[in-house]
Design a protein with these regions (language model features):
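Bacterial N-terminal signal peptides
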Residues: 7-18
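Positively charged n-region of N-terminal signal peptides that target proteins for export
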Residues: 1-5
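Extracellular/lumen-exposed scaffold segments
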Residues: 23-252
Length: 252
């Protein structure tokens, strides 16, 4: 049954505090890998490994107006950025974190992704804090507007050994980190039940959700096997806006 392999993410409104970078803060980043439609680089939130050797970092994309890159489950078309960190030294790289995507609808195709700019955060763990950490990546990505163009970007940066202070990029990495969906318990919400419905109009996934904090524009992103597509939900909220029923069309 579909409900067995779908992984739901119910997303509430995200807020973050505006943080000001110090005028004296350094910047740890790779050079930009530049293309006509998009540029990409690596960025780090600290200018040294510190005692624990753990540094939050990210892949930063900057797109020309109208161009986009894709979320980890892109929808009806496209593929997400695919980094390969095999060339890194003294750096264990965590899986990417994925901020809340935007929905795009073109010619009946529903896709999920990012426009303008985005940082996909990850964590660097150095095995030896007495040595520099070199983060090297080959990033394959697809950027689309009326047409889609694939690129392979080569980028690398060095995070020095020693005490680490926040870089000039720490606040922007933190901003996108705050947009990454939290677990249901951390967000104080619960999907109490989910089921499938068949009708003359097609197949739907329906989910009931409750939240301790009133919902504001809730959305539901579903992930499933290649070949299945999931549209934007039709949402019905209770009067207090602390419970919601979301009905998602399934195609494919």
């Amino acid at each position: 049954m579909i409900r067995h392999f779908l992984i739901p993410f119910l997303l509430t409104a995200f807020a973050w505090a505006g943080l000001s970078a110090s005028a004296n803060a350094s910047e740890i980043a790779s050079a930009w890998a530049e293309e006509e439609q998009a540029t990409v680089r690596l960025v780090a939130s600290r200018d040294g490994l510190g005692d624990d050797g753990v540094v939050r970092a990210g892949i930063e994309f900057a797109m020309q107006p109208g161009w986009k890159v894709y979320w980890r489950s892109p929808g009806d078309a496209g593929f997400p950025p695919q980094p390969n960190f095999d060339g890194s030294e003294n750096a264990d790289i965590s899986p990417l974190s994925w901020p809340v995507p935007l929905r795009f609808s073109v010619l009946g195709l529903e896709t999920l992704g990012y426009e303008d700019s985005v940082i996909l955060p990850f964590t660097v763990q150095a095995a030896d804090t007495a040595k520099d950490s070199m983060v090297s990546a080959t990033i394959r990505y697809l950027t689309c507007k009326e047409i889609c163009i694939p690129y392979d970007a080569q980028v690398s940066m060095t995070i020095p050994a020693g005490n680490g202070a926040p870089t000039a990029l720490a606040h922007i990495i933190g901003k996108f980190d705050s947009r990454v969906p939290r677990t249901a318990s951390a967000a104080r919400l619960n999907i109490s039940e989910a089921w499938t419905e068949h009708s003359e109009k097609g197949l739907y996934v329906v989910a009931n959700a409750t939240s301790e904090i009133p919902f504001k524009g809730p959305d539901l992103y579903l992930e499933g096997p290649v070949g299945l597509g999931f549209g934007a939900p039709a949402t019905r909220l209770s009067n207090a806006k602390q419970s919601a029923t979301l009905r998602i069309p399934v195609s494919g």
